[in-house]
Amino acid sequence: MTGGTDRVGLRSLTGGTVSFGVDEVHGRHVVLVEISGEDRGSLRPADGENLAVAARTARDQRLPLVCFVASSGAAVDEGVGAVHGWGTAAREFVACSGVVPIIFCVTGPTVSGPALLLGLADMVVMIDDTFAFVSGPRMVSQFTGEEFSNEGLGGSTMHERTTGVAHFTCTDRDGAVDLIGELLSYLPDHTDTAPPCWPSGDPVDRPTPEAGDLIPTTTTGSYDVRDVLSCVVDDGHL
C-alpha cells in the first residue's frame, strides 16, 4: 500500500470508523477499505453507507476490493439506523461477488455483523491472535452451557483449521499485506479480463500418478485434497 500522496481518498469528510479510497497493493490498484478506530470500530449509519459506496465503487470501476477490518459491530446507541447501514453494505458486497475479487483481512476483534461479511469474501486473511464471531463466548455459554474463550470460539487458528472461514493466517499486518499482494498477482481485476500469466517450466502434459495414489481404495477411506492439488498445480506451488 502506498499510504502516501498517491492514495485517492473518497468520502474522507464523513468521519466515523470506515475510511476508503483507491490505493495500490504491490502495484495493483484496488479499492482499499479500513474499518477501525474510535469506539472499537463500531459502525454508525454513515459507516454502513461508506462501506456500501466502497463496494459500489469497486464494482463500477472494476477494481479488486480489499478490506482491513476490526469492528465491534453496529453502534448500539444508533439503533436500527446502524443495522440498516450495515445491511445496505452487505447488499453491495453481495453485488460485488463474482464481479471483482473480494479479500478481507481481520486485523482485530471482529464481532456481530462485520463477522458475517467474511462469508462474502473470496479470501480471508486473519492476523494471529485476532478473532471473529457473531455472538461472543458469554452468550454461547448461556445457550449451550459450554465455556469458550475468544480464541476457542472464533480465533484465527480455529477459523483456519476447523471452520474454514480463514484461508490464511499471518503474524502481523505487514505479512498480511504481502500475502494479499501475492494473491492479487494470481487474479484478474474483474471477471471480464484474463488473469495475469506467469512463466512456468512445468510441462502441461506432466503425468501425475501420485495424485491417483492418494485416493483411498475403500469407500470409507479419506484423503487431504490439498495433497492432490499440490501434485497437479504448476511447479507444486499451492
Q: In which residue ranges do the predicted regions lie?
A:
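Small cofactor-carrier domains centered on a conserved lysine used for covalent cofactor attachment
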Residues: 143
